Amino acid sequence: MSKRKTKEPKVENVTLGPAVREGEQVFGVVHVFASFNDTFIHVTDLSGRETLVRITGGMKVKADRDESSPYAAMLAAQDVAQRCKELGITAIHVKLRATGGNKTKTPGPGAQSALRALARSGMKIGRIEDVTPIPTDSTRRKGGRRGRRL
């Protein structure tokens, strides 16, 4: 009888994120969508095609009413920053967005605290841009001819 051949397990060295030289910044794009119901923080590569991290305020708190709160946005932003550092992203461009269209053009309550938490986490911030969709000629707003009566 011959000895049974056993394969030794190969150890693969896996690195996350791009290969960069020392002292070079690796940029990602942080899309912050802050409505009055929730805050989405979505990190992509520079082209915007590949999602790296996506965390919402609703993933951080239990109560539905707290999804859009500044506290939930801050927790989400801290998680995003930690994950970005693991992936090797050291600098970010921020694209801030409100609901827009024929709805409100002002960002929700979580926008400012999310941005502040990203800045305090040690990420370098390149550009901050408002990408709220502003209609040039829109569909009719809801509320009827005489508007919303309080």
UniProtKB/Swiss-Prot annotation:
Cell compartment(s), UniProt: Cytoplasm
GO terms classed as biological process: translation
Protein's name according to its UniProt entry: Small ribosomal subunit protein uS11x
Family in the record: Belongs to the universal ribosomal protein uS11 family.
Keywords: Cytoplasm, Ribonucleoprotein, Ribosomal protein
Keyword Ribonucleoprotein part of the UniProt annotation: yes
Coiled-coil segments on the chain, per record: none
InterPro entries registered for this protein in UniProt: Ribosomal_uS11, Ribosomal_uS11_CS, Ribosomal_uS11_sf
Pfam families: Ribosomal_S11
GO molecular function per UniProt: structural constituent of ribosome
